[in-house]
Every structure is written in C-alpha cells, then in structure tokens.
Curated annotation (Swiss-Prot):
Sites where the protein binds ATP: 290-298, 312
Matching SUPFAM superfamilies: L domain-like, Protein kinase-like (PK-like)
GO cellular component annotations of the record: plasma membrane
Pfam families recorded: LRR_1 (PF00560), LRR_8 (PF13855), LRRNT_2 (PF08263), PK_Tyr_Ser-Thr (PF07714)
Domain Protein kinase: 284-568
Main location: membrane
Active site per the UniProt annotation: 411
Keyword Membrane (UniProt): yes
Protein name: Probable LRR receptor-like serine/threonine-protein kinase At5g65240
Gene3D superfamilies, sorted: Phosphorylase Kinase, domain 1, Ribonuclease Inhibitor, Transferase(Phosphotransferase) domain 1
Gene Ontology MF terms: ATP binding; protein serine kinase activity; protein serine/threonine kinase activity
The keyword Transmembrane belongs to this UniProt entry's keyword annotation: yes
Length: 607
C-alpha cells in the first residue's frame, strides 16, 4: 500500500510541472515551425537541456518557462507549432510581426497560466479557436492585423479577467458578443462585424464609453412612448452612467470615417496616472531618491496595492512627434525582455512630465553594494562578483545582438547594474538615450554617460556605438575587482592616476595583483579568476573601438573560451605601443633640450 502511495505521489509530481527537456523540445519545435534562419535564435540548442538560458526566454525560480517574446524577428513565413501547448507555465507569449501563416493551433488553449497573448501583424488565417476560452487567466489578447475569419467565439465571453481585446483589421464577421463591450479596452474595427443583440447595428461612434446594454434598451422602449421622453431619458441615463463610472473610464476603439485611430496598445505595459506616482513617491520627496544619472532622478515608490517600484523622472524629454513618439519608443524598450535586463512595467506622460516605472530592486545597485553598504552588512563576495559580471555581459549582448533595432546603452556603469533579491545582475537605464536626446539623429551627438566610463571616441566625436558600451562595461569590471570608483581624485595624494583604468594598468604592469583587488574581499578570492577578469576588462577598454571585443565574445571569454589567445595578442600589441611611445618620448626630450640650449637671439629671429 505504501508503495502505491509513493508511486502515485511521484507520478503526480511529474504531471504537475513540465520537465526542462519537454520545455526545450517544445520551444525548439516552435523555432523550427517558425522557420528561423541559422542566425536567428542561434542559442536555442536542441541538445541543451535547460531553455532558461536561451535568448527571448524567461523562467521563474523553479526553471519553468514563463515568457517567450519574439517580436518582429522576420521569420520566413512559418507556422505555429501545436507543441506549444506543452508550456503550461507560460504567462506571456508575444509573436507579433513575424509573417506567421496558417491557423492558431487548438492546443494554445492548454496554456492555462497565460495572461498575455500577442499575435498581432502576422498572416494568420482560419477561425479564432474556441479553446482560447480555456485561458481563464488571460488579461491581454491581441490578434490585430491578420487574416482571421469566421465569428468571434462565444467562449471568449467566459474570460472574466480580460481587460484588453484587440481583434481589428481581420476578416471576422457576424455579431460581437455583448459582454465583450464591457471590457475596458477593445478594438473590433476593420472587420465585417455588427454589435449584435436584438437591434443589429455597425460598430460606429454611437458605441458609448460609459453606457450599458440595459440603459440603451430602456431608451429605445421609452422612445416608442414619446419622442420627448427619449430625449429626457437619454440625458438622464447619460449623466447617471457618467457619474456611476466616473472613477473608471473605458478605452474604446470605434470606426471613424476617413480616419484611423493612432493610439497604441502596450500589452502588459501599464499607463500610470501622474497623481498615482506622485502619491507613491510622497510628492517625489528627496528622501525617496535612489539615485541620479544622465537621464534624471530615480525615486523609490510604494503603490496603493503595496507594490514597491522605482520611478524614473526623465529630463530633457521633449522631441518631435510628442506623446506618440515617446510611447512608440517606450514600447520598443518594453519589448527587450531578458533575465538580465530591467523590465519596464509602466509609464506616465503629461504635458510637462515623462516618467518610467520599474520594479524595485531589493539589493539596489552594484555601486551601492561595493561602496555604500552600511557597517555590518555582508560584503559582495567574489562568487557573486563573477556572476554579476557574466549576467551584465549577457544583458548587454542581448541589447546589441538580439534586439531589432539594436539598443545602445550609452551609460554602462556599476550604478546602472542593479541587483535583485538573489543578487542577479539586471542592467537598467537601457534605451533611454533616444527618449531624452532632443532633435537628434539615430547617432547621438550629445555626450551621454558618466566621467571615467565614457569611451575616448565618444568624447572626441560625440558618437556612440556598441563599442562605447563595451568600454563602459570594461570599467565596470574593474570596479567589481577593485571596489573603487572609475574616477577618484583622492589617488592624487599618492600617484598621478585619477582614472581607475590608468591605475589598474600601472599595477598590472608591475604585477601587483594584491594591490588591485578590493581589500574588503580579505584575500578570499581565486587569483586566476581575478587575473582573467582584469584581462577581459583591459581588452574591453582599448583606445581603438574596433579592437574591443563584441559583447558576445566577452561572454565567451568570461566563460573561459578564447581569452588566452586574445590576451596574448593584446600583450604583443601593448609592447609595440610602449616601445613606440618611449621612442617618441626620447625624441621629444631631445628636441626640448636642443631648444633650451639655443641662444636667445637665435630663438627670437632677425630684428
């Protein structure tokens, strides 16, 4: 009997969650069905058991896949794999803008944890599967701009948590279930649909943001009795319903003749009210300031539901295109989803303000943990510093090589690498340069960044590229090793090297490793690993941008692949440079001596 109970428990645990193998197989099947090229999703390896390290994939702490975001990847007219139904822990599935053909598989109804489904801007055909009605946790459903046909399934009326349904620009026909008009945000335009009910009518501007079906029916009945009564009752119900729903305005899309509504859907991005963030931050009190950078101040906030957030109040935000341009760029940032990137959860815009809302990071930033911890707090140990270096590198690699268009950070430093409750590195402040650079081209001509972290070419030309991020990352590695600031004038008391980079280079040449490493580590580190991190940092901070490695190569070197060869090349080049510098120095000294020895009359020339 005991054996039977144990067996039952084992089987129940197996069925309660999906194994990493099965998750990986399902995702790889999706990659194949989408017809991804060898260059696309190249790290989705069928032989790799754990898909949680794959790009565009996010997992929870139990290694369950919770998010897959593949937006505008330009796949080659693939289809949706029915095997995706295995991913029962999936909460977010975004596949918009990929030219996907065929129908939506029935198995998608097995994704019982799904809260957001975005298949916008593809070539999907056939009917909307009725199995979508099984997704009881679904809040956001976006199927806009496809070729879907047939009627809207009645099963969607059972989705009680749905707050956003966008079905516009398809070939749908028939009646729209009346209960869907109670959803806060909907768009059924550019279809062959009618509003349904006892009195069919097209979905036009008569659809009211604040009325309901019963009030409309009452108005019609009253109209039979008397035309005057219709007007009176109409006014009565209008003001009654307006007052009743004053606290919650529904966002409704309707057809307007000769005009297209340009408002943008943001999936899970939340649009906050200014007053809500003002209250959350205690009127943007200085005591709640977490930090200040080139893009504005960051405030700690507490929402009314108890959620802790970080609110970034942008400066210099005005740019051509106004609110819509800002929103489009905010959406671009929100699409960059990776475990080592700070997730944007919402935004706020007013005539004079632009604010971004992020989750609050429990352990603040790398800079804080290195230099600002309180007495008695644990020191950031060497193992965590290694993990932070690798995590930040992976986040930047994703921005440079997996985002379309790619995102250049422009201010990589220890203060912009945040740490969650598990001390996992989360790169913040990415994508903000485009939001705040006033009337600039795609190549930023205004120097953005922090002294000591800015690459030489950025100072001389004002232009940024992926390689300026690599330089900033290299300086951050030196901060992790030394615990020191990138620029520190107190060093002038003992030496001429104000910049951390020059200071470390000098000590490295003199083989004084013990003087480089952070004294707080108390010699509790592995010497070879410290040397490796310093080598990667110096390769990243070479003066010529073309000689710096790409972030993908940095990741490989930190994982122990290819560093020895690259370091040997750098050392040989450095020897040549030193010899050339000494030769020029001797020539300069000789010339200076010659001038000093000349007669003053010769120097002044003829009179």
């Amino acid at each position: 009997m005991a054996l039977l109970i144990i067996t039952a428990l084992v089987f129940s645990s197996l069925w309660s969650s999906v194994s990493p193998d099965a998750q990986g197989d399902a995702l790889f099947a999706l990659r194949s069905s989408l017809r991804a090229s060898p260059e696309q999703l190249s790290d989705w390896n069928q032989n790799q058991v754990d898909p949680c390290t794959w790009s565009q994939v996010i997992c929870d702490d139990k290694k369950h896949v919770t998010s897959v975001t593949l937006s505008y990847m330009n796949f080659s007219s693939g289809t949706l794999s029915s095997g995706i139904g295995i991913l029962t822990t999936l909460k977010t599935l975004t596949l918009k803008g990929n030219g996907i053909m065929g129908g939506i598989p029935e198995s998608i109804g097995n994704l019982s944890s799904l809260t957001s489904l975005d298949l916008e801007d593809n070539h999907l055909t056939d009917r909307i599967p009725s199995t979508l009605g099984n997704l009881k946790n679904l809040q956001f459903l976006t199927l806009s701009r496809n070729n879907l046909n047939g009627s809207i399934p009645d099963s969607l009326t059972g989705l009680s948590k749905l707050i956003n349904i966008l079905l516009d620009s398809n070939n749908l026909s028939g009646e729209i279930p009346q209960s869907l008009f109670k959803i806060p945000k909907y768009n059924f335009t550019a279809n062959n649909l009618s509003c349904g009910g006892t009195f069919p009518q097209p979905c036009v501007t008569e659809s009211s943001p604040s009325g309901d079906s019963s009030s409309r029916k009452t108005g019609i009945i009253a109209g039979v009795v008397s035309g005057i009564a219709v007007i009176l009752l109409g006014f009565f119900f209008f003001f009654f319903c307006k007052d009743k729903h004053k606290g919650y305005k529904r966002d409704v899309f309707v057809d307007v003749a000769g005009e297209v509504d340009r408002r943008i859907a943001f999936g899970q991005l939340r649009r906050f009210a200014w007053r809500e963030l003002q209250l959350a931050t205690d009127e943007f009190s200085e005591k709640n300031v977490l930090g200040q950078g080139g893009f504005g101040k960051v405030y700690k906030g507490l929402l009314s539901d108890g959620t802790k957030v970080a609110v970034k109040r942008l400066t210099d935000f005005e740019r051509p295109g106004g609110d819509e341009a800002f929103q489009r760029e905010v959406e671009m940032i929100s699409v960059a989803v990776h475990r080592n990137l700070l997730r944007l959860i919402g935004f706020c815009t007013t005539q004079t303000e632009r604010l971004l809302v992020y989750p609050f990071m429990q352990n603040l930033s790398v800079a804080y943990c290195l230099r600002e911890i309180k007495p008695g707090d644990p020191v950031l140990d060497w193992f965590r510093r290694k993990q932070i270096a690798l995590g930040a590198a992976r986040g930047l690699e994703y921005l440079h090589e997996h985002c379309n268009p790619k995102i250049i950070h422009r201010d990589v430093k220890a203060a912009n690498v945040l740490l969650d409750e598990d001390f996992e590195a989360v790169v913040g402040d990415f994508g903000l340069a485009k939001l705040v650079d006033v009337r600039r081209t795609n190549v930023t001509t205004q120097v953005r960044g922090t002294m000591g972290h800015i690459a030489p070419e950025c100072i001389s030309t004002g232009k940024s590229s992926e390689k300026t991020d690599v330089f900033g990352y290299g300086i951050m590695l030196l901060e992790l090793v030394t615990g020191q600031r990138a620029i520190d004038f107190s060093r002038l008391e003992e030496e001429d090297d104000v910049l951390l980079l020059d200071h470390v280079k000098k000590l490295e040449r003199e083989k004084r490793l013990e003087d480089i490493v952070d004294k707080k580590l108390d010699e509790d580190y592995i010497k070879e690993e410290v040397e490796m991190m310093i080598q990667v940092a110096l390769l990243c901070t070479q003066a010529a941008p073309e000689e710096r490695p790409a972030m993908s190569e940095v990741v490989r070197m930190l994982e122990g692949e290819g560093l020895a060869e690259r370091w040997e090349e750098w050392q040989n080049l450095e020897v040549t440079r030193q010899e050339e510098f000494q030769r020029l120095q001797r020539r300069f000294d000789w010339g200076e001596d010659s001038i000093n020895n000349q007669d003053a009359i010769e120097l002044s020339g003829g009179r």
